[in-house]
Amino acid sequence: MNFHSTKPLSYDSSDNEIYNPFLVSTNEEGRVSPTIDKQQQPVLKRAKSIVSSNSLSAFFTDSKSKQQQQQQQRDRKRNKDRRNRPGRLRRSHSTNSNDQFIMNTGSFKLPDQDEFQFTMNNNSDNGFSSSTSSSDLESVPDLTDDNIDELTPETTPIKPVGNFYFNTLFDNEENTDGYYYKLNSQIKIRNELQQQQQQQQQQRLTSSSPSIFEIPEIVYKIISYVDEQNTILPQESTPIRRNPLSYKHALLIHGDKKSAQSALQKTTNQQSQQNQQPSSVISSSPLYNCLLVNKLFYKITSEIISTKFYSHNEQQLKKFIENKSHQQQNSSSPIIIQPKTFILHKLFQTKQIIFDQLIEFINFDQLSWFELYMCPKISLDKPQSQTFMKIFQSCSNNLTKLIITGSKTIDDEFLMKLGQFKCGDNLQILDLRACELITDFGIYQLSLYCRNLTFINFGRKPISNGNGNGGGNGGSGRYITDNSMIKLINNNRKLSTIGLAGCHITDKCVWEIANKLPNISRLSLNNCPKLTNSGINQIFTLTNTPNSNYFKCLSVLELRFNHQLTDLTSIIKFKRRQKFQFNIILLLELCESLMLKYRQQEFELDKLISLKIFQDISHWVNDYNDNDGDLSYNEIKHLINNNNNNNSSNNISTRGF
């Protein structure tokens, strides 16, 4: 066998110092030493042993490596289904020999060790003995790199040893070995994954849950509130008090000059505001902004807008008809709106042709409020057109409010058809003011079908008597009398508002109203020439009795232009009775002449009441014959004298003591 000899080391290896040929240090004696201090030395590599393949060392090394390979194969089979713990070093449990311990842990660095420390056998002395044989080099572990070109037979820099100690997720676990540690770690990882999945699901649910502005029912309520709060329909509002006819009239109503002037100024301002209010309100409606939010808002807002159709401008109405007709030509399906409210307000010049074109795009099945306010040229009962059939036959079950004022075509036949199509079954508000062709016959026919009316108005415009204040006895009001009104009152006991201005009713109708309608709150009897002074006084005198139930809820009474009324004392007492007994402030509407009579008679009544109060007080003070327990003047004088005598006698007796 051929052996490759090596040169002996140039220093004693028992000092356990590392030789670095590239650095030189000087001792105290001045000689050069190839050794350096451990704290200043760089990391060096240990020389790799070069062993011949024919040597005994190679033989033992090969056999030893084969045994290690076999042992590794057994370990792989044993740990095939097991997973090694990452980042932890397993210590060998075998402590039979120091060599095995050196084999398992000699190549690792502990935190409290130096850069490298040779492991000593038990059989060796205090240090490594220098030897020229290859067996000494075989005991040194191989710590060189795989790059053989950089190796030399002599010593080379040592490869730095890495620190294999680091923290893991389960450093706080007491059981860090074996099957239980693996099971606990798997359970913890599984729990963490489940928690992450739950959090992700919750995030998905929260992100996928719709907003309240994406729920159609809530959006519908929101837009409905916006519509109710901001949409002002073009209609005549009920005034709190009618406008004064003149400055003298305002002075009689309010009592002082400042109040009269402010009342006249308010009337002029209200008239100007009523003329400007509809256009400004309609153009600034917030519903048009709701159309621009999103598709859902647009759909619901357009549905709510289509439930109310109203117009007060003839030009806008014509544009609407043109747009609808153009859309109808471009689309295959008919474009029809279905409103619940239909109002045409003060369209004095609108003709029947425009109205017929308009109703072609409207379905009246859900109609509950139909109003034609001062549209005199529109007819609803024209024989050639089926206007009445299209409107009122389809909405007979839903119609609750019918207002047609100032029409020159509405007559008794129209009211008869309303009853025949059962439009009066649910009708509650009926306003037919200034419809000159309606007579007792039509009202009587309508009263046979209407049972739920709460508001009626058949008022007529008074004819001027030459003074400009009305009060004439002519006009169409003579066609409405007690014959129809008493029948209507008897069949509708829920009436609370009645307007009979200009009608030729008598005291009998007023008596039926007081006797049959306990809920009456507003009564308009302006310019009723058949009313008499004696009848009105008797009715209101009976209401002033203690046990009377007549007109208990009456809060508005209009008696303008009834110049035949001369005695208003019963009405004055009734007004005071409403205030003190029922806490109702009665609003009494009178014309200028009647208001003057009212103030004069009220002043005379106050004088009479004050005189009676003074007489009662004087009678109570000076009455001698009434045995009511009060002492007379002589008795009081006698008691005073007796009192004085007793006091003087007491003073004399005290002086004697």
From Swiss-Prot:
Cell compartment(s), UniProt: Cytoplasm; Nucleus
Gene Ontology CC annotation, any one: nucleus
Keyword terms: Cell cycle, Cell division, Cytoplasm, Mitosis, Nucleus
Residue ranges of the region described as Disordered: 57-140, 262-282
Main location: cytoplasm
Classification via SMART domains: LRR_CC
One GO term (biological process): cell division
Biased amino acid composition, Polar residues: 94-107
This protein's record includes keyword Cytoplasm: yes
Basic residues biased stretches: 75-93
Compositional bias segments (type: Low complexity): 121-135, 270-282
Role description: Negative regulator of the mitotic exit network (MEN), required for multiple cell cycle checkpoints. Required for daughter cell separation and chromosome stability. Involved in copper sensitivity.
Protein name (database record): Antagonist of mitotic exit network protein 1
Species lineage: Eukaryota, Fungi, Dikarya, Ascomycota, Saccharomycotina
